[in-house]
């Protein structure tokens, strides 16, 4: 072949289509590499992908379980908080009732003590009045006896006579005091 023909023949070959022997060798090499990868590498890849899928699904399940548990804990917390508020309100109400009862008891005790003090004061005043009246009666009786003895001119040493004169004199004084008060 002439060099020109050779160049023309080379030009006729399509550079995109490889020669058949290269195509066969490439195809055999591809099948060998693909077979090797399918036997050795593909199971490992599938295993890793399956583990990742299970881990992701397990993570999702764990997240859902954690969310459910968190929701449950939140509801328990809210229930406990509501119960604590109710208990606090009950204790506050109890304290107010006890305070009102204590105030009422203290007022009643104060009223009772006041009444006792007033009664004791009245009794003391009455006793003092009787003692003063008795002392006054004796003093007035002595003075009246002395005056009556001077006026009558006789001695009123006799106790019975002295008592009659004193009683009569005091009765006259009481009558005069009563009529003086009535005229006012």
UniProtKB/Swiss-Prot annotation:
It is found in: Cell membrane. InterPro entries: ATP_synth_B-like_membr_sf, ATP_synth_b/b'su_bac/chlpt, ATP_synth_F0_bsu_bac, ATP_synthase_B_chain. GO terms for cellular component: plasma membrane; proton-transporting ATP synthase complex. It comes from the Bacteria. The chain crosses the membrane at residues 16-36. Keywords: ATP synthesis, Cell membrane, CF(0), Hydrogen ion transport, Ion transport, Membrane, Transmembrane, Transmembrane helix, Transport. It is a single-pass membrane protein. GO terms for molecular function: proton-transporting ATP synthase activity, rotational mechanism. Pfam families: ATP-synt_B. SUPFAM superfamilies: F1F0 ATP synthase subunit B, membrane domain. The keyword Ion transport applies. PANTHER family: ATP SYNTHASE SUBUNIT B, ATP SYNTHASE SUBUNIT B', CHLOROPLASTIC. F-type ATPases have 2 components, F(1) - the catalytic core - and F(0) - the membrane proton channel. F(1) has five subunits: alpha(3), beta(3), gamma(1), delta(1), epsilon(1). F(0) has three main subunits: a(1), b(2) and c(10-14). The alpha and beta chains form an alternating ring which encloses part of the gamma chain. F(1) is attached to F(0) by a central stalk formed by the gamma and epsilon chains, while a peripheral stalk is formed by the delta and b chains. F(1)F(0) ATP synthase produces ATP from ADP in the presence of a proton or sodium gradient. F-type ATPases consist of two structural domains, F(1) containing the extramembraneous catalytic core and F(0) containing the membrane proton channel, linked together by a central stalk and a peripheral stalk. During catalysis, ATP synthesis in the catalytic domain of F(1) is coupled via a rotary mechanism of the central stalk subunits to proton translocation. Component of the F(0) channel, it forms part of the peripheral stalk, linking F(1) to F(0). Belongs to the ATPase B chain family. HAMAP family: ATP_synth_b_bprime. This is ATP synthase subunit b. It comes from Streptomyces coelicolor (strain ATCC BAA-471 / A3(2) / M145).
């Amino acid at each position: 072949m002439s060099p020109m023909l050779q160049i023309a023949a080379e030009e006729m070959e399509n550079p995109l289509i490889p020669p058949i022997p290269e195509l066969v060798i490439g195809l055999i090499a591809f099948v060998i590499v693909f077979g090797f990868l399918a036997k050795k590498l593909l199971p490992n890849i599938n295993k890793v992908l399956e583990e990742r899928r299970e881990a992701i699904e397990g993570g999702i399940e764990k997240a859902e379980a954690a969310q459910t548990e968190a929701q449950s804990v939140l509801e328990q917390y809210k229930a406990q908080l509501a119960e604590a508020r109710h208990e606090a309100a009950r204790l506050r109400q109890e304290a107010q009732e006890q305070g009102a009862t204590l105030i009422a008891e203290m007022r009643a005790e104060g009223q009772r003590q006041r009444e006792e003090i007033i009664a004791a004061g009245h009794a003391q005043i009455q006793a003092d009045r009787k003692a003063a009246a008795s002392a006054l009666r004796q003093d007035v009786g002595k003075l009246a006896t002395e005056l009556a003895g001077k006026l009558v001119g006789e001695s009123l040493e006799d106790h019975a006579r002295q008592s009659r004169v004193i009683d009569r004199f005091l009765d006259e004084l009481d009558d005069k005091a009563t009529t003086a008060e009535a005229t006012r």
